[in-house]
């Protein structure tokens, strides 16, 4: 169960232009040299990021003890980021982002979470509906050297799940938004909140879920409504059945990408955005700012994201373009480029090739407004 926390020279240039880092707090070694300079750096950070943190055990969120603890955590993280960026040979950088006063454990519990319990092998097997993989016959040698579904208009803006473990809903919705644009020509921003509130048979709202279960729910429910009709609140509430009955976008089902096969994942992403799971609870992922991520991570999958493209840098490093749900002030304006092709038949970096799936939509059919059945809110 995911608790949470995604060529030619011209294509390379376009990818570089789209990879600008989010705004972060710049600092130098001198900012770490004394208590006074560290306090000044911390206040600069606090003036940028107004975020609410869980109180320390037994304390109050704004008392002196908790404030001191937050400062100490910030200092440790700032020093880690500085030392990591000083090391050579890493094609990515870290930054003091909005998570800079959170311990790794707090970050994991709030934005990542319940790890390997979600694996499909523990939830009824693999293969999606019918066990097929429609892109299996595609010739790998004939795939485009780079794909970016953002540039094809099939990706909505970056969203922010907040302190709610609903990454699975954002991953699901990104994939459905993408295939709907490809099949109908319409990019519609869809409702994660409907999934959080209403898809409660197998998924657990802010306490985690699986993208495959969410695809099943959308099909079974007859579609999914829009973000504007059922806005996101970053908390689980009572299902608004009247709003959820507005089936603005439909799918026919879903399929799973063969596990541990980056070649198969590339074939799928060449055709549509794909829901994927990664391990995102390490410090390098927490503070990622820009570049091709090659940082420390394992395969305890704890975060749902969407693979919305792939490419290659000028120096030949292959990468995935991954849409996250932590807001535009994380990573490359909400995205992360993750190293691709780590090894043949591998799990992929951070397990990205282990649990990928995508929605199936055969044509331009969506529910018409005239056919909507509005039910009483319950």
Curated annotation (Swiss-Prot):
PROSITE patterns xref list: THIOL_PROTEASE_ASN, THIOL_PROTEASE_CYS, THIOL_PROTEASE_HIS
Principal subcellular localisation of the protein: other
Disulfide bonds: 164-206, 198-239, 297-350
Segments forming a coiled coil: none
Name of a matching Pfam family: Inhibitor_I29
Keywords: Disulfide bond, Hydrolase, Protease, Signal, Thiol protease, Vacuole
Signal peptide (residue range): 1-24
InterPro entries: Papain-like_cys_pep_sf, Pept_asp_AS, Pept_cys_AS, Pept_his_AS, Peptidase_C1A, Peptidase_C1A_C, Peptidase_C1A_papain-like, Prot_inhib_I29
Localization, UniProt: Protein storage vacuole
The keyword Calcium belongs to this UniProt entry's keyword annotation: no
Induction data: Induced by treatment with gibberellin (GA3).
MF GO annotations: cysteine-type endopeptidase activity
Protein name: Cysteine endopeptidase RepA
Species this protein is from: Oryza sativa subsp. japonica (Rice)
Encoding gene (name): REPA
């Amino acid at each position: 169960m995911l608790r949470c926390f995604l060529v030619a020279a011209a294509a390379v240039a376009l990818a570089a232009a789209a990879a600008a880092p989010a705004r972060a707090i710049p600092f130098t070694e001198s900012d770490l040299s004394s208590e006074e300079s560290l306090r000044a750096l911390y206040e600069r950070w606090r003036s940028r990021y107004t975020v609410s943190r869980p109180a320390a055990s037994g304390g109050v969120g704004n008392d002196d003890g908790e404030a001191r603890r937050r400062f100490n955590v910030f200092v440790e993280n700032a020093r880690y980021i500085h030392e990591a960026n000083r090391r050579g040979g890493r094609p990515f950088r870290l930054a003091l982002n909005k998570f800079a006063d959170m311990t790794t454990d707090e970050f994991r519990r709030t934005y990542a979470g319940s790890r390997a319990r979600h694996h499909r092998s523990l939830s009824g097997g693999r293969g999606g509906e019918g066990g097929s993989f429609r892109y299996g016959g595609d010739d790998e040698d004939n795939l485009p050297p780079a794909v970016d579904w953002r540039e094809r208009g099939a990706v909505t803006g970056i969203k922010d799940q907040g302190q709610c473990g609903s990454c699975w809903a954002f991953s699901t919705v990104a994939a459905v938004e993408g295939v709907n644009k490809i099949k109908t020509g319409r990019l519609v921003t869809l409702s994660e909140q409907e999934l959080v509130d209403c898809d409660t048979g197998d998924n657990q709202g802010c306490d985690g879920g699986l993208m495959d279960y969410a695809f099943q729910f959308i099909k079974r429910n007859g579609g999914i409504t829009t973000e504007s009709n059922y806005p996101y609140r970053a908390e689980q509430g009572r299902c608004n059945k009247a709003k959820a009955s507005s089936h603005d976008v439909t799918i026919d089902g879903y399929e799973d990408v063969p596990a541990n096969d980056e070649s198969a994942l590339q074939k799928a992403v060449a055709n549509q955005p794909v829901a994927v799971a990664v391990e995102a609870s390490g410090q390098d992922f927490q503070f990622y700012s820009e570049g091709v991520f090659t940082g420390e991570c394992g395969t305890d999958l704890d975060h749902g994201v969407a693979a919305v493209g792939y490419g290659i840098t000028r120096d030949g490093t292959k990468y995935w373009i991954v849409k996250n749900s932590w807001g535009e002030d994380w990573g490359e304006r909400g995205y992360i480029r993750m190293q691709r092709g780590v090894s043949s038949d591998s799990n992929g970096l951070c397990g990205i090739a282990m649990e990928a799936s995508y929605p199936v939509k055969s044509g331009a059919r969506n529910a018409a407004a005239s056919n909507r059945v509005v039910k009483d809110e319950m």
